[in-house]
C-alpha cells in the first residue's frame, strides 16, 4: 500500500508532516509513503533512510491564501497537485494534505475524480464526544448548498465509513435540525427526514440538535455544508474558550493552583478525549480513492493518525463499498 503525502501543506510543514510519516512507517509494516514537495527541504528533515519512503520533487506550493480553483489549474507542479496525480494515475492508493482546504477539494474532485453515482462529495471530520468514541459530521463545507438526495448520500457514505473504519456495527444516523420533532426544520430537512426514514440500509434515528452532538447522540450526523461548517467552527471555538477559561481559573490564586496540581492527571485525560488529532483528518467522501484533509495546525501526531485513517480506508476498500451502496440505493428508488 502506498499513500502520497503533501509535505509542504500545513502550518508546521514540512517537519511535522515528515515526523508523522516516519511514525506511520514505523507503525505499519505494509505501508509505503511518497512525500511530495521540495526535495532538498524534505531530505534535510528526514531522520531515516527507510526504503519505504520516496520523495517526489515539486517546484511549487499552493499557499493558504491562494484561490483554490485558480491555484490547482495554474500550479501544475505544486506538491498538492502532484500528490493528487499520484492517486489518479494509480501510483498511490490514497493522499493526505494539511494545506489549502479548497484547493484540496478541487484537486480531489477534478484530478482524483468522483465516484459514479455520487452527486456531491462531502467533507467529513470525526469529532470528539464525552465518551471518547466520537461522531462523524458531514458535510462541513464541500458544498454550501445541498438537496435532500445529497444528504441521503452523505448518510450512506458516513454509514459505510463508520462501519468499516470506526468499527461501528450499525451506525446511528441523525439529521441535524433545530428540534427533535419529526416536522421540525426547513424544507430541506423535512424532505430529507422523510427520505431517510424510508431508506432501508440506513439506521436513521431522526432529528438531532447541535447541543446534543458531544453527548454521543449519533454516530453519523448529516447536514448541508453551510450549517456543518458553522457547527464545526462553533464546537472548535467553544472548546478552545472553555479550556482557556479553565486555565485562567486554575492559575488565578495559590489555592486554585494547588487544586490544579491535584487535578492535572484528570484534566489531561479530559483534554485527550477532546483532542481532534487522535481522530485523524477530514475525509473527502465520494471520490474514487481516499483523500484526507489534515487540520492546518497538525502536529506529527495528527499526521500519523491521518495516515492510520487513510490506511484503514484503503484496507477496507471504503471507496468501492460506497459506490456499491449508492448504486444499490439508486436501484431501489
Swiss-Prot record:
It holds the Pfam family FA_synthesis. Disulfide bonds: none annotated. The keyword Aminoacyl-tRNA synthetase does not apply. It comes from Bacillus subtilis (strain 168). Keywords: Cytoplasm, Lipid biosynthesis, Lipid metabolism, Phospholipid biosynthesis, Phospholipid metabolism, Transferase. GO terms for biological process: fatty acid biosynthetic process; phospholipid biosynthetic process. GO terms for cellular component: cytoplasm. This is Phosphate acyltransferase. Pathway: Lipid metabolism; phospholipid metabolism. Catalyzes the reversible formation of acyl-phosphate (acyl-PO(4)) from acyl-[acyl-carrier-protein] (acyl-ACP). This enzyme utilizes acyl-ACP as fatty acyl donor, but not acyl-CoA.
